[in-house]
């Protein structure tokens, strides 16, 4: 996993509450186990009409929001069924930071396990951040736990364990590999039946 220290990018705004994993990535696209290729289906039923034409009224389709890598959204983001495909779709689309009023627990952990930073922020701060010009680069500094625009600084907090994992680009496998020698020693000591 790539370390996450400072991210600079533009933001897309989708301030709906209770966006569930079915809305993030519909079930019909979950037939693969690769982590890539899901971005084109992100928010599929909102982004496209029945003929697969872009919905011009959907915020991510606005010309000045394309290429955004920060998503500012509502409360309880990622609720519903637990599917890791939802963070995969967000990451494959290009999002590195999701800022919401709150997250479903499993979705929150899956974001971090996939190198994305989910930030919990109150509504007033999100609304101020959402007013940032669509072309402005927003800086998210994980080490200092601060988001900076040309006019505001917003502080956020993150659990120390998750912060260290993201800063160092560590996932479960890379953490396990740090103990490879200890694992081998243990396996030598354990009787084989």
Curated annotation (Swiss-Prot):
Highest taxon of the lineage: Bacteria
GO-annotated cellular components: 3-isopropylmalate dehydratase complex
Keywords for this protein: Amino-acid biosynthesis, Branched-chain amino acid biosynthesis, Leucine biosynthesis, Lyase
Pfam families: Aconitase_C (PF00694)
Protein name: 3-isopropylmalate dehydratase small subunit
Catalytic activity from the UniProt record: (2R,3S)-3-isopropylmalate = (2S)-2-isopropylmalate
Subunit field text: Heterodimer of LeuC and LeuD.
InterPro entries from the UniProt entry: 3-IsopropMal_deHydase_ssu (IPR004431), Aconitase/3IPM_dehydase_swvl (IPR015928), AconitaseA/IPMdHydase_ssu_swvl (IPR000573), IPMI_Swivel (IPR033940), LeuD (IPR050075)
HAMAP family assigned: LeuD_type1
Described function: Catalyzes the isomerization between 2-isopropylmalate and 3-isopropylmalate, via the formation of 2-isopropylmaleate.
Family, as annotated: Belongs to the LeuD family. LeuD type 1 subfamily.
Pathway connected to this protein: Amino-acid biosynthesis; L-leucine biosynthesis; L-leucine from 3-methyl-2-oxobutanoate: step 2/4
BP term (GO), one: L-leucine biosynthetic process
Organism: Bacillus cereus (strain ATCC 10987 / NRS 248)
Alphabetized CDD domains for the sequence: IPMI_Swivel
GO molecular function: 3-isopropylmalate dehydratase activity
EC nos: 4.2.1.33
């Amino acid at each position: 996993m790539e370390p996450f220290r400072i991210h600079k990018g533009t933001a897309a705004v989708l301030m709906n509450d209770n966006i569930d994993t079915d809305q993030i990535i519909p079930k019909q696209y979950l037939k693969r186990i690769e982590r890539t290729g899901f971005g084109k289906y992100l928010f599929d039923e909102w982004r496209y009409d029945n003929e697969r034409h872009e919905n011009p009224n959907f915020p991510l389709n606005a010309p000045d929001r394309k290429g955004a890598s920060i998503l500012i959204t509502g409360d309880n983001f990622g609720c519903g069924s637990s599917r890791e495909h939802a963070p995969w779709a967000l990451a494959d689309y290009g999002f590195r930071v999701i800022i919401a009023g709150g997250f479903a627990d499993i979705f929150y952990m899956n974001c971090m396990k996939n190198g994305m930073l989910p930030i919990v922020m109150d509504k007033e701060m999100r609304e101020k951040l959402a007013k940032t010009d669509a072309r402005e680069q927003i800086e998210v500094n994980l080490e200092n736990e601060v988001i900076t625009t040309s006019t505001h600084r917003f502080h956020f907090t993150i659990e120390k364990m998750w912060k260290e994992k993201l800063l160092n680009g560590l996932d479960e496998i890379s953490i396990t590999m740090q103990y490879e020698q200890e694992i081998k020693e243990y396996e030598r000591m354990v009787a084989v039946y």
